[in-house]
Regions:
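Non-heme di-metal
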Residues: 1-177
Length: 177
């Protein structure tokens, strides 16, 4: 299916701008976070945004030349490691949490707010979308942003209440067994 309108191209251009801002935010947050868990999480989110940008830019370039196929907008299953990749390491190490990133909980909350604004933007555009491929693209973007939001929420929980985080993630019981 060949590209016929500029609506999808405009949308992709806007998405690239949003992703660039998110990538810059995560790079900045990683540089300011003195704790390895926070730094690793922010770096992982930055790298995920870069992968999304690479794919979006390549697809946009092909479509804007008229040589692209709208099927290129169909995203494969995106990588959503969630908290399992970073947080699994914590459960194994069971290191004590430094207070280095407690000051950066505000950065985590800002990231959550940024992801939430992205979700709201994509939901609003989804309501207006008429083309099935555009709807599929937006649905994918919403799922992607939600996975990032969940990862940040988990990181915030880890820093705010580490003991309960370990109890919940480690499936620790309180019966003493």
């Amino acid at each position: 299916m060949k590209a016929s309108g500029s609506g999808l191209l405009e949308l992709m251009c806007t998405v690239v701008e949003i992703k660039e801002k998110m990538k810059a935010f995560y790079a900045d947050a990683a540089g300011k976070c003195g704790d390895s868990v926070g730094t690793e999480t922010f770096n992982m989110l930055r790298d995920m945004e870069q992968k999304h940008l690479d794919r979006l830019n390549a697809t946009y370039a092909d479509l804007s030349k008229g040589s692209g196929d709208l099927d290129a907008c169909r995203f494969y299953d995106f990588e959503a490691p969630g908290s399992s990749e970073v947080m699994h390491k914590l459960k194994q190490k069971r290191e004590s949490t430094s207070n280095a990133c407690l000051d950066d909980v505000a950065a985590i909350e800002s990231g959550m707010e940024l992801e939430n604004k992205g979700i709201e933007f994509f939901l609003a555009r989804l309501k207006e979308a008429a083309e099935p491929i555009e709807r599929e693209f937006l649905t994918h973007m919403i799922a992607e942003e939600r996975s990032h939001y969940i990862l940040l929420a988990d990181l915030k929980f880890y820093y705010v209440d580490t003991e309960h985080w370990f109890m919940q993630k480690g499936k620790t019981g309180l019966d003493g067994a």
